[in-house]
Amino acid sequence: MSTITQFPSGNTQYRIEFDYLARTFVVVTLVNSSNPTLNRVLEVGRDYRFLNPTMIEMLVDQSGFDIVRIHRQTGTDLVVDFRNGSVLTASDLTTAELQAIHIAEEGRDQTVDLAKEYADAAGSSAGNAKDSEDEARRIAESIRAAGLIGYMTRRSFEKGYNVTTWSEVLLWEEDGDYYRWDGTLPKNVPAGSTPETSGGIGLGAWVSVGDAALRSQISNPEGAILYPELHRARWLDEKDARGWGAKGDGVTDDTAALTSALNDTPVGQKINGNGKTYKVTSLPDISRFINTRFVYERIPGQPLYYASEEFVQGELFKITDTPYYNAWPQDKAFVYENVIYAPYMGSDRHGVSRLHVSWVKSGDDGQTWSTPEWLTDLHPDYPTVNYHCMSMGVCRNRLFAMIETRTLAKNALTNCALWDRPMSRSLHLTGGITKAANQRYATIHVPDHGLFVGDFVNFSNSAVTGVSGDMTVATVIDKDNFTVLTPNQQTSDLNNAGKNWHMGTSFHKSPWRKTDLGLIPSVTEVHSFATIDNNGFAMGYHQGDVAPREVGLFYFPDAFNSPSNYVRRQIPSEYEPDASEPCIKYYDGVLYLITRGTRGDRLGSSLHRSRDIGQTWESLRFPHNVHHTTLPFAKVGDDLIMFGSERAENEWEAGAPDDRYKASYPRTFYARLNVNNWNADDIEWVNITDQIYQGGIVNSGVGVGSVVVKDNYIYYMFGGEDHFNPWTYGDNSAKDPFKSDGHPSDLYCYKMKIGPDNRVSRDFRYGAVPNRAVPVFFDTNGVRTVPAPMEFTGDLGLGHVTIRASTSSNIRSEVLMEGEYGFIGKSIPTDNPAGQRIIFCGGEGTSSTTGAQITLYGANNTDSRRIVYNGDEHLFQSADVKPYNDNVTALGGPSNRFTTAYLGSNPIVTSNGERKTEPVVFDDAFLDAWGDVHYIMYQWLDAVQLKGNDARIHFGVIAQQIRDVFIAHGLMDENSTNCRYAVLCYDKYPRMTDTVFSHNEIVEHTDEEGNVTTTEEPVYTEVVIHEEGEEWGVRPDGIFFAEAAYQRRKLERIEARLSALEQK
């Protein structure tokens, strides 16, 4: 690491990229590269300040300077005073040695001019780089001369090594002596070297520091032979367990020594295990130790390892935090486009009740996680059956999932289906789009696109007409080419060769492709996922419902073109009894499979590998431990790194039975197995978590998990499992899944750095969407309250909404809608498409008896686009009532008539001559016929039924009599319903029905445990408004005008006859 960093000026904050012992050793300079005489050394506090140990903030104007230089200039005055005769602590020794090393590094990095330039400003006595280097050696040698700091022994000349510090020494195996390098660092020593061949022996080259035994006695912390009291004092000061006589070799019983260390060390102060393994006959309080582990054999021959804080470089994150039952992240996690996906089952309890296949995601290496997202809805036949998934992964760029259908009553498998969908990704491409002349289809070339018809794609900067924005795949030509349908065509061929363009796919906007596989025989569950190549993958399975057990895999060799085609293969039969839930992974042509042991009194889990995808196997049995959870794993280098969690406290060390129903403290372990050795006899299972919940909250059982590798870290995602309800401690008597009586089952992620020495911390972090989750208060009555305003920018799906008064005095409740649209009946009910409608009711239910009601019928309803107003009064205030379109719709109908109309004046009927044909007078044929029409008195039959002879008498005509007159006079065809004269009307009408609320019904529901619950469900019934029929009618105004014309003609004829008589 360089001790000099330079940045372009103009920023506010700058990073310090080197280590330093004191802030006074950090020098910040504004540089004018054109005129160095103008360079300005800044003063901390006035010109800049430290934001934290690795960041400064500029307070001064940087105008006139083009570079900000930050470098380290360590003072040569000893930071630690060795002359006072006091006992030095290990931290003092380390600081002194670091000071020497820092000065040497600065001598390496800084030029003579730079050293002179900052000599005064930094308070350094190093006049130039050579003086700094000599001073560093002087400090290091003075410390060593006092016998206070030893050399660090490294590898030998024969094996080779890169020496980077003055304190590192190499062994020359030929003479048994150690040598330090006295020249410029770093010094690379190739394998097969000697001191002579790699630089020579003498000042400025290799200098002997004596034989290895002497050096180890004086300065090696493992020795303490010549100066035992010095070492013991140091260890006691450091709270190193060896100060109390502990060996830490993993063989010697260190129980007594550790007990003494605990007794002598104040509570709250940690005992340092110095990275060693201590064998004990009973576990001490591990929380009081750091940087160590303990090997404990509660059962002889069955050792387990327990790691303390800082021994394993790992962190524990909580990645979900919901009131739901979040479990079963088993063998489904994967990494895609640098995002970690952790699929799991989200439900209200063990089983498939209200279950949704879900996932959470992390785009920042597991530091924070998204809110849970449901991938499946409830099954259409819910609550009889529901969806479930234990196998999911990405092949090429498409997500594949084995979606199982299971019964709620017994969790029994009834069907398997392979669902797949494109993952979201963004591509930056060059060329590859063509569009022929006079065609609307464009061909898109994207190697291994993984898309199917209907999948969403988005284009920008394509340089081809019509290929832009959101589109869908129209046809698939092959795995590298597909087409989209553009909105237009052009007269010439188009090709975007050489053009840079962008294409995106969307998981959420694309449909599932679903391939039904039916009920696969001899399968209890399908587990795990392993991508084999760009075309196919494997899924594990087990059968444990009936004997004999089966464990194996399904191999889908061509999942894109033949998703229903798979090959079934089993592990060796001697490993199948009592085995289940295989974890599978595929690395470098080898398929690995680990089973789960299911019986505490039988042999446990087993490990298998196959180089021909399950046709032949090499198998191992894990010794001693019975595993009641799966053992997910990943291959890192030559090691399989496996994780497993207990389902009962002390299961792995004391053989406790699988007991998910008891509140306890199950733990998580991990182990490594080298695939080149392929031997599990000496495998070490190391405890990495004591229990998974923060704050020491107990949980009743730890569920199965998944393992992924990203960059330099391995991630183990796992969760709680409780058979009774979503709460991990206790149970509510009514078994209401939405009442709180414990701590919810949630998911956790253990993140561990990959390396031969896994040490740093063992922390718990809350990574479940901090500051992004909706604040929810969850009361014990099952009601959730969101005490904050919320804004939804997309579709919001709600099963039931109650809007309460928004004011303290309960004056009103308001729904305020901004924009062009209000309530829209969007979705069609899946169980009854004909029932698409929206009901607005002024009362507390959907029945018109509770209040006035308006019902809007959707286009897919049996009564398409109908509006029904139901109330005792329909009042229109302060405005005219008008039809939208002029003279198009009628008021009432032949079967839906108003009884009467109350008007303040006579109605006005349009009689504009400009809208009529040339007027003609009544012809004699019509008037002759009209003379035969009878005017009568009558009573309505329905009125007679109600009132008898007191029914009112009406005046008018009979439409059928007018019809008969017209037929008799040749004005209508016999048996015809069509009349040329509008005075007579005939209408046929269809049967009219409606679905209305009838009553509430108590419905019983039985869960998988036989518990019966009841709900009150509304019952609707169909009512007939009227049956199919026909009606004859007349237009009264036509009758009046016809009668007037008839009478006028009659009077005219009488007047003509009188006039003729008078003339005689």
UniProtKB/Swiss-Prot annotation:
GO cellular component terms listed in the entry, alphabetical order: virus tail, fiber
Is the keyword Hydrolase assigned to this protein? yes
Annotated BNR repeat ranges: 360-371, 496-503, 608-619
**EC annotation from Swiss-Prot or TrEMBL:** 3.2.1.129
Residue ranges that the Swiss-Prot or TrEMBL entry lists as coiled coil: 1044-1064
Q: Where is the active site?
A: 581, 596, 647
Family matches, as InterPro entries? ATP_synth_asu-like_sf (IPR023366), Endosialidase_beta_barrel (IPR024427), Endosialidase_beta_prop (IPR024428), Endosialidase_C_dom (IPR024430), Endosialidase_C_dom_sf (IPR044914), Endosialidase_N-extension (IPR024429), Glycl_Hydrolase_58 (IPR001724), Phage_T7_tail_fibre-like_N (IPR005604)
- Keyword set includes Repeat: yes
A Pfam family per the record: End_tail_spike
Which SUPFAM superfamilies does the UniProt entry name for this protein? Phage fibre proteins, Sialidases
GO biological process assignments? adhesion receptor-mediated virion attachment to host cell; symbiont entry into host; symbiont entry into host cell via disruption of host cell envelope; symbiont entry into host cell via disruption of host cell glycocalyx; virion attachment to host cell
Effect seen on changing residue 549 to A: Almost complete loss of enzymatic activity
Give all residue intervals belonging to the Peptidase S74 domain: 911-1064
GO terms, molecular function: endo-alpha-(2,8)-sialidase activity; identical protein binding
Assigned keywords, A-Z? Coiled coil, Degradation of host capsule during virus entry, Degradation of host cell envelope components during virus entry, Glycosidase, Host-virus interaction, Hydrolase, Repeat, Viral attachment to host adhesion receptor, Viral attachment to host cell, Viral tail fiber protein, Viral tail protein, Virion, Virus entry into host cell
Q: Where is this site: Binding to sialic acid?
A: 542, 545, 549, 578, 598-599
In the record, the effect of residue 350 to A/N/Q is given as: Almost complete loss of enzymatic activity
Q: What is the effect of changing residue 647 to A?
A: Almost complete loss of enzymatic activity
Please state which protein family the record places this protein in. Belongs to the glycosyl hydrolase 58 family.
Query: What name does the UniProt record give this protein?
Result: Tail spike protein
* Taxonomic lineage of the native organism: Viruses, Duplodnaviria, Heunggongvirae, Uroviricota, Caudoviricetes
